[in-house]
Amino acid sequence: MENRWQVMVVWQVDRMKIRKWNSLVKHHMYVSKKAKGWYYRHHYETHHPKISSEVHIPVGQARLVTVTYWGLTTGEQSWHLGHGVSIEWRLRKYKTQVDPEMADKLIHLHYFDCFTASAIRQAVLGRPVLPRCEYPAGHKQVGTLQYLALTAWVGAKKRKPPLPSVTKLTEDRWNEHQKMQGHRGNPIMNGH
């Protein structure tokens, strides 16, 4: 019998981001109680030797499963050290891979307070308006002038600790171009 291979998308991350993700998930499960119904599965509760943890997040009838791995083949950079994350959307027997932005949007829609464009209608009708959105990155599109005015009027408030974000977990800050503040460099070399 031949080997059967299963291919999955695994996002390479460093282990400190995985530790931060796990601690944020546990905080919102046990302290803030915003992550109701979430299930955290430890590495010793699974039979797969490369799985370090799993987080099962109910989203309607389906659920998002974020699996963190260790002991994978070493990544492109030395700090990756073979750690990774896969994100899966499951509904009964159907499973599919999900990118981090989509996972964050699904979590945001089901679990955390949101100040959305419907707030304009609520304010016009004289109903109470939710004062903030706990995941503003979920609203990347440019809002209407009324929406922008209402958000400026309500004001933003920093959340401590931040909400668990799959996008933040998988972002690659190491390979981004580093900008030095206040450093012009050699004027001959930079074209001035």
Curated annotation (Swiss-Prot):
Modified residues (Phosphoserine): 165
PTM description: Processed in virion by the viral protease. Highly phosphorylated on serine and threonine residues.
Motif (HCCH motif): 108-139
Residues bearing the modification Phosphothreonine: 96
Membrane topology classification: Peripheral membrane protein
GO cellular component: host cell cytoplasm; host cell plasma membrane; membrane; virion component
Residues with site note (Cleavage in virion (by viral protease)): 150-151
Segments for region (Interaction with host APOBEC3G): 40-44
Pfam families recorded: Vif
Induction trigger: Expressed late during infection in a Rev-dependent manner.
Single GO molecular function: RNA binding
Segments of this protein annotated with the region RNA-binding: 75-114
Sequence motif BC-box-like motif, residues: 144-153
GO biological process, one term: viral life cycle
Region (Interaction with host APOBEC3F and APOBEC3G): 54-72
UniProt region (Multimerization), positions on chain: 151-164
Assembly and oligomerization: Homomultimer; in vitro and presumably in vivo. Interacts with viral RNA and Pr55Gag precursor; these interactions mediate Vif incorporation into the virion. Interacts with the viral reverse transcriptase. Forms cullin-5-RING E3 ubiquitin-protein ligase complex (ECS complex) by interacting with host CUL5, RBX2, elongin BC complex (ELOB and ELOC) and CBFB/CBF-beta. Within the ECS complex, Vif interacts directly with host CUL5, ELOC and APOBEC (APOBEC3F and APOBEC3G) substrates.
Function: Counteracts the innate antiviral activity of host APOBEC3F and APOBEC3G by promoting their ubiquitination and degradation. Acts as a substrate recognition component of an E3 ubiquitin-protein ligase complex: mechanistically, Vif hijacks a host cullin-5-RING E3 ubiquitin-protein ligase complex (ECS complex) and the transcription coactivator CBFB/CBF-beta to form an active E3 ubiquitin-protein ligase complex that targets APOBEC3G and APOBEC3F for polyubiquitination, leading to their degradation by the proteasome.
Miscellaneous remark of the record: Vif-defective viruses show catastrophic failure in reverse transcription due to APOBEC-induced mutations that initiate a DNA base repair pathway and compromise the structural integrity of the ssDNA. In the absence of Vif, the virion is morphologically abnormal.
HAMAP family attached to this UniProt entry: HIV_VIF (MF_04081)
Similarity annotation: Belongs to the primate lentivirus group Vif protein family.
Domain remark text: The BC-like-box motif mediates the interaction with elongin BC complex.
Name this polypeptide is given: Virion infectivity factor
Organism encoding this protein: Human immunodeficiency virus type 1 group N (isolate YBF30) (HIV-1)
